[in-house]
A protein has these predicted regions:
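Internal intein/HINT superfamily modules and their associated LAGLIDADG
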Residues: 96-99, 105, 116, 131, ...
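Short beta-strand
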Residues: 61-63, 97-104, 139-143
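Active-site-adjacent loop/helix surface patches within enzyme catalytic domains
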Residues: 74-76, 81-101
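Helical (often loop-to-helix) elements that flank the catalytic cores of nucleotide-handling enzymes
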Residues: 84-92, 112-139, 166-187
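DNA replication initiation on ssDNA origins
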Residues: 1-71, 80-88, 156-157, 162-165, ...
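Histidine-centered divalent-metal-coordination microenvironment in nucleic-acid enzymes
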Residues: 74, 96-122, 148-161
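Flexible helix-coil linker/hinge segments at domain or subdomain boundaries
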Residues: 130-168, 189-204
Length: 233
């Protein structure tokens, strides 16, 4: 079935899920909407409807009942985002990440693993990678490193890509800046998905780049750093 690999890649907590009801767009062009948690099993019908673009998009909570996960994400919430420049920076830093366009036009930057790993390891590595890429302060999923389902914890969900497949505009982007079909995304996943040992071995030391404008505004130096990284390739 078409959902099988997609489901295996994005599997998370199975006793609750998220949904998002889109609303109108704001003055900045960002779509408004209502996000909420539904307590119940994540059924095959939900996965299938998501890929078919039927009903609300599916949000999955990455952290499971045993506090492990097989995917995590840096959520870069910027409108009119330059995904290609980000991918160049990712490859320049030799990070095993896949970039997807988010529903707002920003980026969901995924780290995938072939097996469940501790949520604490996933979260800490993604925080370090966000700093390297210049997006410190971005939301990181999983947001929790521990949940207690006995007391009703669920964790936070992330809206998945490929709602209505390519038509939904939430798709992976390859190293050339082109959008990927679902099958092309699966091939990207096969290339970049890591084992636990590979995640532990990811080097996350921030590169020391001399400030272009010593004593200048942080935002200006951040922009200059991104330009330096872009032309290092």
């Amino acid at each position: 079935m078409i959902i099988d690999k997609f489901k295996s890649i994005f599997l998370g907590l199975e006793i609750a899920y998220g949904q998002y009801q889109p609303g109108e767009r704001g003055d900045n062009g960002k779509q408004k909407g209502k996000a909420f948690i539904v307590r119940g099993q994540v059924t095959d019908e939900l996965w299938s409807n998501h890929l078919a673009g039927k009903g609300p998009a599916l949000g999955i909570i990455p952290i499971t009942e045993d506090n492990s996960c097989r995917w995590g994400c840096i959520d870069i919430d910027e409108y009119n985002f330059d995904h290609t420049s980000l991918i160049k920076s990712i490859r320049n830093n030799k990070l095993p990440l896949i970039v997807c366009r988010s529903k707002s036009g920003g980026a969901h930057v995924f780290l995938f693993t072939k097996e469940n790993i501790p949520a604490s390891l996933m979260q800490s590595k993604l925080k370090q990678m966000a700093i390297i890429l210049g997006y410190e302060g971005s939301e990181i999923f999983p947001k929790q490193t521990e949940i207690l389902v006995e007391r009703g914890d669920t964790g936070n969900f992330l809206n998945l890509p490929y709602y209505n497949q390519m038509k939904g505009l939430r798709y992976a982007i390859n190293d050339n800046g082109a959008g990927c079909t679902l099958e092309e995304f699966y091939k990207l996943y096969d290339v970049w998905a890591c084992t636990k040992e590979q995640v532990e071995a990811i080097k996350t030391e921030e590169k020391k780049i001399e400030e272009a404008f010593p004593g200048g505004p942080p935002c200006l130096n951040k922009l200059a750093t991104k330009m330096q990284e872009y032309f290092l390739l």
